[in-house]
Amino acid sequence: DNTSGVHPKVMEALNKANVGAAEPYGDDPWTAEAEGCFKALFGDDVDVFLVPLGTGANVLGFNRMIRSWHSILCSDMAHTHTSESGAVEAVVGCKMTPIPSVHGKISAGALSAYLTDMGSPHHSQPGLVALTQSTEVATVYTPEEIKAIVDVAHANGLFVHMDGARIANAAVALGCDVRSFTKDLGVDMMSFGGTKNGMMMAESVVVFNKDFVRDFVTLRKQNLQLASKMRFLAAQYIAYFKDGLWLENARHANNMARLLADLISGMPHVELAHPVESNGVFVNMKPEHIAALQRQYMFHEVEPSAHTVRWMLSFNTSEEQVRTFAKAIGALA
């Protein structure tokens, strides 16, 4: 989904926004309309800040929520921990503490075990729990799992952030509206992605906890995430939300992942590494099979020790492509 292009309706919206001039830095009608789209999802009391980059959205959110003496508790597979080049540590100056996960998810019980040194002057103080929805291995937290984690976090004075780079895929997988497993469960802030689901380059920070709204616009600028021509970020979101395009895109991607998993199930030379719950399929394969397949297709081996590969499906992945790919996998046996 990182390699796919832009949905035609999003591209059309960009072209329409590219006519004439508009006030910069978000003082334009497109940004106001996009913010209204978010309020329609989450309620009028939320605050939304559009940004160009996913890593920037996460780091900006973290930087507003905690201080340098805090630690962020996250899954050992969390993108913010493994794949953002130390951006959190460099910008926020805090420690990332990974918690062993099961299929990419942490539990309330596992979280509790990391809250034993609260108040100690010798240790970084846990200040934030960072969740990813859907996870880095395409699994999905249930509302019950999120609520349990939020309850433990808040009871111990920690805030909760959700990295929603693929939040649409999670919403489709759960079959419920996005507010019901974020704001309504007490999540304090989230990154709301779109780039991986048919947009060109736009993300957003959605703030539920009003304590974090003050000075956010200034921090966004200081953290290099204030776009001058904001209307081009906003126009994408307007098209993205119109007529449920964001859910339609995610539903197709999820369905293609399920189709691929079904087609390769039973093949003796491949093994599912994680449950297929959104738009990714992770499998264990022999090194020679990986090498042979990579000569035809572009994909990554994400866990070399287990020879686990990652196949992500997108809004524009066709059923024919999936069946052709599955046939190539079958031919390796």
What are these regions (language model features)?
Residues S68-W69, R258-L332:
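Conserved C-terminal alpha-helix-loop-beta "cap" of PLP-dependent enzymes
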Residues H103, G127-T135, V140, D177-G280:
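Active-site C-terminal subdomain of aminotransferase-like
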Residues R64-T82:
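Conserved PLP-anchoring active-site segment centered on the Schiff-base-forming lysine
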Residues H7-G54, D76-M77, H81, A87-E89:
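Conserved N-terminal alpha-helix of the aminotransferase class I/II PLP-enzyme fold
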Residues Y141-A171:
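Catalytic PLP-binding core of fold-type I/II PLP enzymes
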Residues K95-M96, V160-M162, L272, F299-E301:
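Hydrophobic beta-strand scaffold residues
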Residues V92-G127, L131-E136, Y141-A148:
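PLP-dependent aminotransferase-class I/II
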